[in-house]
C-alpha cells in the first residue's frame, strides 16, 4: 500500500452552508444541530466521516485496498468473513464463525494480527479511522477494535446559527380523494440561512506505523476527499455546502514538535467588523499567526 506516513499532522477545515441543513438532529425534528447554550451550529464527526467514505467509494469504486467497511445497509459481518476466509474459515453462520475463530486463536497465536492486517490492508476507512469489528469481538480477539490514526472532532460554527423553518407546498397529490378536494399537500423543512463551520483533525503517524499502515498515498487521498467531500453530495435538504479552507500542519517527526492546541490557536477566524449578519464566506477573515508556530512545523493551505 506504499510507504507508511512518518510525520504527525493536524489540520483545520472550514466549510459553510447556505440555506441548508448540514446535519439534522433526530432529537429535534431533524432541525440543524445547535448548541442550546451558545447557539453555535454543530456537525458531528460521524457525519463528516460519512462524506469522506462516500467520496472514497465514488472515486475508487471498490478498487483493491480501497473498499469501504462502514456502508449503508450492508452487514458488517459480510466484510468480516472476507478476513476469516483468508485464514481458511469458510462458514457463513455467525455462531460457527465465532467458534472457528476461537479454535484458530488457540492454534495460531498470530491470528489476531493476521485478521487485523487483512482488514486494514483491504478497507481504506479502517486504515484511516479504525473500526469495531463485532465478529472478532465476539470471538474475544484483540483485533476486534482497531484505533485509526485519523480522528476528527465535532465541527462548530464560528457564530451562532439561526434554525429557520420553511413551509413548502406540493402540487402533486397522493390520492384521488385529494384530487376531488383540490387540496395541496404542505410540509416543512428546516434550514440555516448561513453558517461557517470549523472542524479540527489529527493524524497519528505512531498509530499508522504500529497498527493500520496508513500510507502517504492514503494521506493524499484523504486531503482530496476532505476538499471534495460535499461536491458529490449535493441535495435540496443540505443546500449549498462547500469546503473553504484546509490548513495542514506537518510536524518534523512521528510524535510531533508541539501540542496540537498551539497550532489550532494560531488559526484565527473572525467576522469582519462591518458585518452584523454574515451570509457569505467573504464576510469572514482567516489569518494564521506564524509567530505561534514552531519553525519545525510546516504549514500548508491546501485550498
Model-derived features: where do they sit?
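RNA-binding basic/glycine-rich loop and surface signature characteristic of RAMP-family CRISPR effectors
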Residues: 1-303
Amino acid at each position: 500500500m506504499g510507504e507508511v506516513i512518518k510525520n504527525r499532522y493536524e489540520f483545520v477545515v472550514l466549510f459553510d452552508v447556505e440555506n441548508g441543513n448540514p446535519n439534522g438532529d433526530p432529537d429535534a425534528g431533524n432541525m440543524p444541530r445547535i448548541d442550546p447554550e451558545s447557539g453555535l451550529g454543530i456537525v458531528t464527526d460521524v457525519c463528516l466521516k460519512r462524506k469522506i467514505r462516500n467520496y472514497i467509494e465514488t472515486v475508487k469504486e471498490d478498487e483493491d485496498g480501497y473498499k469501504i467497511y462502514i456502508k449503508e445497509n450492508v452487514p458488517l459481518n459480510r466484510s468480516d468473513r472476507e478476513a476469516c476466509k483468508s485464514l481458511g474459515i469458510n462458514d457463513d453462520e455467525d455462531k460457527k464463525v465465532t467458534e472457528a475463530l476461537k479454535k484458530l486463536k488457540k492454534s495460531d497465536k498470530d491470528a489476531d494480527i493476521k485478521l487485523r492486517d487483512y482488514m486494514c490492508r483491504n478497507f481504506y476507512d479502517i486504515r484511516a479511522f479504525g473500526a469495531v469489528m463485532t465478529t472478532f469481538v465476539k470471538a474475544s480477539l484483540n483485533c476486534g477494535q482497531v484505533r485509526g490514526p485519523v480522528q476528527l472532532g465535532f465541527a462548530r460554527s464560528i457564530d451562532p446559527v439561526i434554525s429557520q423553518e420553511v413551509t413548502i407546498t406540493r402540487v402533486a397529490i397522493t390520492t384521488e380523494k385529494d384530487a376531488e378536494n383540490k387540496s395541496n399537500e404542505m410540509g416543512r423543512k428546516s434550514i440555516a440561512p448561513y453558517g461557517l463551520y470549523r472542524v479540527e483533525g489529527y493524524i497519528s503517524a505512531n498509530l499508522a506505523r504500529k497498527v493500520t499502515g496508513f500510507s502517504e498515498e492514503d494521506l493524499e487521498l484523504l486531503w482530496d476527499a476532505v476538499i471534495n467531500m460535499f461536491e458529490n453530495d449535493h441535495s435540496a435538504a443540505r443546500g449549498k455546502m462547500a469546503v473553504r479552507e484546509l490548513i495542514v500542519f506537518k510536524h518534523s517527526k512521528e510524535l510531533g514538535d508541539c501540542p496540537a492546541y498551539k497550532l489550532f490557536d494560531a488559526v484565527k477566524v473572525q467576522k469582519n467588523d462591518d458585518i452584523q449578519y454574515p451570509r457569505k464566506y467573504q464576510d469572514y477573515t482567516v489569518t494564521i499567526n506564524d509567530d505561534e508556530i514552531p519553525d519545525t512545523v510546516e504549514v500548508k493551505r491546501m485550498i
